[in-house]
Amino acid sequence: MCTPDENDYKTSTDPDTSANTNHTLEKKKRKKRKNTNVACVNCSRLHVSCEAKRPCLRCISKGLTATCVDAPRKKSKYLAGIPNRELPMNIQPDLPPRKIMIPIYNNSSNSSLNVNNMGEQQKFTSPQHIVHKAKFLSNAADSEYSILSNIIYQDTLSNKIPIDILYSNTNSTSNSTIGNSSNNSPTGTNTSPEETEMEKIRQLYSEQRANIPPHPYPSSNQNVYSILLGPNSAKIVASQVNLFANHFPLVPVDSADNSLNFKRLLPRDPSEKSSQINWDSSINQYYLNSETVTFPELAIPLKRRKNHLVSVSLESCSPDAANIKSNVEWEHSLRYSTPMEIYTSINAPFSHTPGFHHLLVYLKHRFNQQDLVKMCRSIAEFRPIFIACSVTLTEEDMIFMEQCYQRTLLEYVKFIAQIGTPTCIWRRNGQISYVNEEFEILCGWTREELLNKMTFIVEIMDDESVRDYFKTLSKVAYRDFRGSEKMKVCRLLSPIKGKIIHCCCMWTLKRDVSGLPLMILGNFMPILN
């Protein structure tokens, strides 16, 4: 008896199996659709696949070419209340890249409008980036948002930095920064189009400045910056450049006798060594003041007595020292000493845009790429909060904000004068706005040296403290609305090169009526042990 072979079972298949085989072959013959990031309105409504080109094939076959447009994306939560016409426009891949135009800032009273009207143009190669267009009712708010976008989307993002550099453990020198190639590249045939555009802007800016009345020079009365701005201090002072509109960082100076005699109008006599430092041996106490002896000058005496309990006392000053010190020319600081002057004289908002711009340039020249990326990310957290708080503010609102700042600063100055804690106040862009006499004694920098020019709080901090500064800033200003934070260790740089003051710093944040960070008060106490 014959048994059926196994091949008989393979060949004698039923009709259902052959139909499935033919269906599989037809699927393989079909062309695969290319995925697209954005579907059209018609395909999105029916939840079917779409194409990148417009009109798509499905809309052509259905006769819906007139309505075949990209479906709108879902808005983020902080953009929910903004009309579509005021939202950022997506850059299409076929659009040519746009050039970068960085405005040159002038800190005169009518310069804020000139800066705000220049607009922002950015050069992006990725279609996911956005081009900023005016979306605020205030020119000051729109200008500040533009510079925040410039900080975030400039060549400081991680996707613009090679992976091996970003995540390498090698410590780059502080001088190797992003964007320094422009300083080293020779002029002539190697000049980039952006540099050519910047040169045209500088020429136009110089022509406009010719019609502006001369601005009083900060150092005309006291030549405080003749040696404190680095090797080119004398040239900077001789050029009469506007130190409020242009930023030159403070640079510590070598001191042979570890004193501040190099910048005092009446320096101490070098022959009288320790007799000038008031010292009470019975109670182990030093007496300091802002005129003759400051805390950085006690570094060597305190080191000799590190095994003993030592106290520091401030000598009583004249009653005139408690008077409110205001200066009309210091737009970033306290300008008036009465509330009536504040409300009647301030008729323009304070522009934070130049401060953010020069802060970024300063950080580029001081830190490496990896540190700079982390700092820019901390600044980037401020952008959505700024949109939510400022989108409905008008120019009059921004003027009122500056009046609130000056009025609040006036009250704080009266209160700070009654206490002995070293205190420094700075704006949200890091620009120092006020210091008391105790802070002068603690760090060695005088009030005129810090406020007679554009000075940032990070200038007088060491590198590690600057890194902690931006971490603390993102906590106290953008995340935690309690308004207070503590830096356990903050190292302040003194005018004496190599002399660092170890402090503990307590932050207190003051917000304006819209919720934006208005000012930051820093209370510094020295760590003696």
Curated annotation (Swiss-Prot):
Residues 174-193 have a biased composition (Low complexity). Keywords: Activator, Cytoplasm, DNA-binding, Gluconeogenesis, Metal-binding, Nucleus, Transcription, Transcription regulation, Zinc. This is Transcription activator of gluconeogenesis ERT1. Residues 1-31, 174-198 are annotated as: Disordered. Residues 14-23 have a biased composition (Polar residues). One of its GO terms (cellular component) is nucleus. Belongs to the ERT1/acuK family. Gene3D superfamilies: PAS domain. Present with 85 molecules/cell in log phase SD medium. One of its GO terms (biological process) is gluconeogenesis. Signal peptide: none annotated. It is found in: Cytoplasm; Nucleus. It comes from Saccharomyces cerevisiae (strain ATCC 204508 / S288c) (Baker's yeast). Transcription factor which regulates nonfermentable carbon utilization. Activator of gluconeogenetic genes like PCK1. Involved in restriction of Ty1 transposition.
